[in-house]
Amino acid sequence: MLGKDYMLAIILVNCDDDLWGDHSLEVEAGLPPGWRKIHDAAGTYYWHVPSGSTQWQRPTWELGDAEDPGTGTEGIWGLRPPKGRSFSSLESSLDRSNSLSWYGGESYIQSMEPGAKCFAVRSLGWVEVPEEDLAPGKSSIAVNNCIQQLAQTRSRSQPPDGAWGEGQNMLMILKKDAMSLVNPLDHSLIHCQPLVHIRVWGVGSSKGRDRDFAFVASDKDSCMLKCHVFCCDVPAKAIASALHGLCAQILSERVEVSGDASCCSPDPISPEDLPRQVELLDAVSQAAQKYEALYMGTLPVTKAMGMDVLNEAIGTLTARGDRNAWVPTMLSVSDSLMTAHPIQAEASTEEEPLWQCPVRLVTFIGVGRDPHTFGLIADLGRQSFQCAAFWCQPHAGGLSEAVQAACMVQYQKCLVASAARGKAWGAQARARLRLKRTSSMDSPGGPLPLPLLKGGVGGAGATPRKRGVFSFLDAFRLKPSLLHMP
């Protein structure tokens, strides 16, 4: 986002009109310092020159304002606002500060329901996104490109037909199962987006774009996928984390409802029916993604996670032998399993895989110091960890995003299994309580046996599954995109 001083320089350089003799700019008596009354085709409004804010209402004096309007601001009072700008009742809600200091803000926040979260944002507009760009491995790049495109061109491009909110300051409210965008002045609703209809959301990954937030959703009128981009007054990771928490809550509630209604509905809950808990990726695809890569090998490591551990292992594998000794492989990544077959033997189904790892065992992934290298750490059980590394062309970003998406699917499955287990445990406890109430003290009937939990794997595999996936998500939730260089 361009700073106010830089924007002021652009206005001064690119404006050829007489800035000092414009009769549309009136210095009206009684206005607070820095305010100008303006008449143009849009009507009559008031412009605060130092901050660039505009509003239809006449500004009022505040305690501490100087009595002489010309004091300290006379040198810039002759400036006009940027040409071609239109003003509407919604666009009058521009920033007066970098925080939520809008009129009635504190009382409005206090009136919201418990658990709701507020963020001050400015809409940068939207860009259409093709469906194929939301596939795992592509969505991160697509969303980041949308953020960069709107961030770089918003000052000189016109909003597309049907765009809502471009250039406006808004209040983004996250509560229950919806994201609401509200006018910060009159608290009117601008847009309401159900969370379950959001396909992807993300945070800007380029330098200086950490306050840019974007989400992709289908427009109900045009039936196209739109990536909406916002600039936030706080690091956008806070919005992404809040969305993740709300989606986890929705997931848990739906699992409970499904458990209560299991006797009435034979259909199990499907991951397609759940909100997509993603950051810069779509984590619900069940189809395997395939990538060509050079298999560098595996190496035991001492810790389950850490970029330093991963970089050290990749460095050791890189220095161990010649690049010509690395095996060209076709790496297949699904929501449950990663498999590497030699390319010459990939067509043969009977050939043993060169390397294989269940996604549930992954504890850490990352791109190495060389952007061509990708590594992951797997939990083999009994405090034993192993790093596997691959060399990718043109870079390891696509493979990293695909594995990241697979881990998110496993995380969803763990949440579903955990909620279902808690529901079964509660049902058994209630049944045991009813039995105690209806049986005599000397009843020969013993306590009800607890059901055995059966998951995708049994025995010793259950513990690494939870430890691997949840430890990976703990690290993933607190870090930026894994496409970042260490």
From Swiss-Prot:
SUPFAM superfamilies in alphabetical order: PH domain-like, WW domain
TM ranges: none
Domain (WW): residue spans on this chain: 29-61
All copies of domain PID, residue ranges: 113-280, 285-440
Keywords: Cytoplasm, Nucleus, Repeat
GO biological processes: positive regulation of protein secretion; regulation of DNA-templated transcription
Localization in the cell: Cytoplasm; Nucleus
Role of this protein: May modulate the internalization of amyloid-beta precursor protein.
Name recorded for this polypeptide: Amyloid-beta A4 precursor protein-binding family B member 3
Species assigned in the record: Homo sapiens (Human)
